[in-house]
Amino acid sequence: MNIVDCKSALKTLNNGLPIVFPTDTLPAIGCLPKFSNTIYEFKKRDRDKPLILMGSEYQQLINYVHESAKEDYENIASKYWPGALTMVIPASEKQTTILTSNDLTLGLRIPNSYMAQSLMRLSLIHI
């Protein structure tokens, strides 16, 4: 496996291809949100299971959270992130269904990994 820098990984992401990167738990397969169908197809993932959207800080992901869940999201995120916790939470109605599972939920996480957070900060997007 080649180890590449964040800028090379970002170029791959911008070309619509997935990357594998380390997190604080297991390696992640990631892509830009607009290419999320790639992950469902690549992993043969059931559409009933939400994908995990990662960011470098919890405020980055607040717009993906349904209005009814924002208070709980902020309370839990500020206490447990960065870290290994993935929140499965109702997705904002503003977000496209391409990012959500069939039940309109989304997994959100801020990994406690310098490399993962650097990649997300550099890209100014979420993976």
What are these regions (language model features)?
Residues 1-126:
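Active-site-adjacent structural elements in enzyme catalytic cores
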